Design a protein with these regions (language model features):
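Outer membrane beta-barrel
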Residues: 1-82, 93-95, 102-110, 164-166, ...
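Outer-membrane beta-barrel pore domains
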Residues: 10-12, 22, 34-36, 111-259
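A broad detector of the eukaryotic-type serine/threonine protein kinase catalytic domain
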Residues: 82-84, 148
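Active-site cleft segment of glycoside hydrolase catalytic domains centered on the general acid/base Glu
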Residues: 87-92
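Short, hydrophobic/aromatic alpha-helical segments in well-folded domains
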Residues: 97-100, 128
Length: 259
C-alpha cells in the first residue's frame, strides 16, 4: 500500500505465424482470472484466485502457439527464476514452470486448463487449475477452481473457487454501457510457501473465507478502456479466522483507465 512497482517489462518476438516467444518480467501464464491484466478485470477487487492463491509475476521465458483452424486452441508454457519481481540476484537449482492450455470450441466458449510449479523457499508447491466461461454480446458467465498442494505435507492443501456473471446494457448518452455484476468466491487457509522465521514451518498468510460481491460498472468508452466500478463486498470467516483490515466488508469505488 502506498508503493509503486513496475509489474511488466518484457520483449516479445513472432518468428513465424501464430508463434511467439517472450522474455522478461511478466505475469506467469496460469489460470483465467490471475492472468488478466488490471484493465481486464471485471471487479474493483480481484478474486482470491487472482490476488492470493494463484497470483504470480516473475522473470522468465515463455512460448505461445495459437491454432485457429479445426479445433482452435492456445498453448502457453514458460520457465521462471522463482525470485519474484525484485530479487533476481540469487542462483537457483530449481526452475519454476507453468503450462496453460485454452480450448476454444467456438467464439462463445473458453475452457482453460493450467498447472504451475513454484518453490518460494524450501517447499515445492504444485498448483492445478480448471476454468470455463461463456460470453456473448451481453453476458459473461465464468467459473474457475484452483487446487494447491505443498510438498512433504508442509501445509494442508488449498482449494479456491471463483464464479461470477456480468451483464452489459448498452447506453446512448454519456456512458457507452452499464454492466451489472455478481460474484461468489472462496478459499481455504492459505500459505505463501515462506517459513516462519522462528518456528521454521509454513504459517497461514490468508485465512479461509467466503465472499459475495455485487456491483455495477459504467464504461465511458469501449469496454476496459475507461471504467468506473462500484462494488459491495460481504465476507464470511470461520470463528478462528483473523481477517486483515483490507479483507473485510466494504464498498469499493474504482476508476480505471488504459492509455
Amino acid at each position: 500500500e502506498g508503493s509503486i512497482k513496475m509489474l511488466d517489462a518484457y520483449a516479445r518476438v513472432f518468428p513465424v505465424k501464430d508463434l511467439n516467444f517472450t522474455i522478461g518480467q511478466m505475469r506467469v501464464p496460469f489460470t483465467i482470472d490471475a492472468h488478466r491484466s488490471p484493465h481486464q478485470q471485471y471487479f474493483a477487487n480481484r478474486s482470491f484466485i487472482a490476488k492470493q492463491v494463484g497470483n504470480v509475476r516473475d522473470v522468465g521465458f515463455t512460448g505461445c502457439y495459437t491454432q485457429k483452424e479445426g479445433l482452435p486452441f492456445i498453448l502457453e508454457g514458460g520457465l521462471f527464476n522463482g525470485s519474484g519481481l525484485t530479487n533476481q540476484k540469487e542462483w537457483h537449482k530449481t526452475l519454476n514452470y507453468s503450462i496453460k492450455a485454452q480450448l476454444l470450441p467456438n467464439k462463445n466458449w473458453n475452457l482453460t486448463l493450467s498447472t504451475q510449479m513454484i518453490k518460494p523457499e524450501h517447499t515445492r508447491i504444485n498448483m492445478y487449475d480448471a476454468g470455463i466461461y461463456y460470453q456473448n454480446n451481453r453476458f459473461h458467465i465464468e467459473a474457475e477452481y484452483l487446487y494447491k498442494m505443498y510438498g512433504h505435507e508442509a501445509f494442508k492443501d488449498v482449494h479456491a473457487v471463483n464464479s461470477f456473471v456480468n451483464y452489459d446494457l448498452p447506453l446512448k448518452k454519456v456512458f457507452n454501457k452499464i454492466s451489472f455484476l455478481a460474484r461468489y468466491d472462496m478459499m481455504t487457509d492459505h500459505s505463501n510457501g515462506l517459513a516462519d522465521s522462528e518456528t521454521g514451518v509454513l504459517k497461514i498468510n490468508d485465512y479461509a473465507r467466503h465472499r459475495v460481491t455485487g456491483g455495477i460498472t459504467l464504461s465511458l468508452s469501449k469496454a476496459f478502456i475507461a471504467d468506473l466500478r462500484l462494488n459491495f463486498e460481504k465476507y464470511f470467516y470461520q470463528k478462528s479466522g483473523v481477517p486483515k483490515e483490507s479483507e473485510r466488508d466494504k464498498i469499493v469505488i474504482e476508476f480505471m483507465t488504459r492509455f
